[in-house]
Structure formats: structure tokens, C-alpha cells
Design a protein with these regions (language model features):
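Conserved ABC ATPase signature
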Residues: 41-78, 100-104
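Charged, surface-exposed helical/loop "interaction arms" that form contiguous linear patches used
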Residues: 1-40
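Walker B catalytic acidic pair
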Residues: 96-97
Length: 198
């Protein structure tokens, strides 16, 4: 019962902080609630917890797993992990394709939030977003290759020129142009990286 009481007391502040993070991540009107349901005592206490969300004003909050889109789910989990990161839950945060369903300013803000998190711990992020990749301290290209009828996955660290070229490819798709290379170089400069700093 003491654990249950502490969970209840902490949940309001936790929700307030998660909503604050989500507002920064372009989700200002989201409703985020921790639902604690009383269950028979088991190894984790006497509560079952789930996150309820409503991304649309006027709609009731429902289980996150049932209503959040890919982009919403990615940003919600980033918000939750950001709030929990202060509780010393681990030295590494991993995000796989956190850019799903987002673009533009939302991707930029996700990248900034990841960079902020990386100040205190290791953050690994798989992304297809140039805005997010440009903000990373290190950039690796992950590439599948078929050799002798078998598929291999290679991981290649990129220097400044490699980053610029890969960001340009991420921006333009197949054909890299002088304009996309210039855009990629500008993205890296805005993130604080230059050819001299690599």
C-alpha cells in the first residue's frame, strides 16, 4: 500500500513534466495520464499502470498503445524517457526510427531533445531524418549489402565530408546535387560542426 501511495503521489508531477516535454516536441494540446488500477498483490506491488493519451482536444484519454500514431508514439516515448532520465535508470537511451511520421520543425525539435539528453548519457538513434542526424555528435551509415548470395549489414563511421554527403542523400533521395550538399553543410554548421572541427 505504501508503494501504491507513492506511485499515486508521483504520477501527477510526472504527467505535468511529460506534458511539458511534449509541448516542446510540437504536441502542445496532448492529454497524458498515468492510470493506476488496483490488482491483487504481485511482485511489482498492487497496481497495474498504463499511459493514457488524447492527442486531440475534447477526446477522452485512451490507452497509448491503441490510439497513438507512429510519430506521436515516438515523441511520447522521448518525452517519457527524458523525464525518467533524471532518475538514473541507465547510461544509454536507444531510439529506433524516432522520426516515424514526423518532419520539419517536429524533427528538428526531436533532434534538439536527443542532443540535450546526450549531454548526460549515451544516446543511440536510428533515423531517416536529416534534421535529426545533423545534430548527432557522431554519425554512422548503416548499409545492407548482398555478397555471394547473403545479406550483410555494415556500419560505417562518417567523417565531416561523409556526413555532408549522407545528409544530402537523406534530403534529396537518390540524386545528390550541389544545392543539397550546400544544404547539408549548412545543417551541420547550424549544429556546430564544420570541416575544421571533425
Amino acid at each position: 500500500k505504501e508503494l501504491s501511495s507513492k506511485r499515486k503521489n508521483c504520477s501527477e508531477e510526472f504527467c505535468r513534466r511529460v506534458k511539458q516535454e511534449l509541448a516542446f516536441l510540437n504536441m502542445p494540446g496532448i492529454e497524458f495520464v498515468v492510470e493506476l488500477e488496483r490488482v491483487p498483490l504481485y511482485s511489482m506491488g498492487c497496481d497495474r499502470m498504463q499511459f493514457l493519451v488524447s492527442a486531440n482536444r475534447g477526446e477522452p484519454a485512451k490507452p497509448m498503445s491503441k490510439i497513438a500514431s507512429g510519430g506521436e508514439l515516438s515523441r511520447i516515448m522521448l518525452g517519457v524517457k527524458t523525464v525518467l532520465s533524471g532518475s538514473n535508470l541507465g547510461k544509454t537511451m536507444i531510439f529506433d526510427e524516432i522520426d516515424t511520421g514526423i518532419s520539419g520543425s517536429a524533427a528538428q525539435k526531436v533532434g534538439l531533445k536527443l542532443k540535450e539528453a546526450a549531454a548526460n548519457r549515451q544516446v543511440l538513434c536510428v533515423t531517416h531524418s536529416a534534421q535529426i542526424a545533423a545534430l548527432g555528435n557522431h554519425h554512422f551509415l548503416i548499409k545492407k549489402e548482398v555478397r555471394e548470395g547473403r545479406t550483410f549489414t555494415g556500419v560505417y563511421p562518417l567523417d565531416f565530408e561523409g556526413r555532408k554527403r549522407e545528409l544530402a542523400r537523406m534530403i534529396s533521395g537518390v540524386k545528390v546535387t550541389d544545392l543539397t550538399l550546400k544544404s547539408a553543410e549548412e545543417m551541420l554548421a547550424l549544429a556546430g560542426f564544420s570541416n575544421e572541427s571533425s
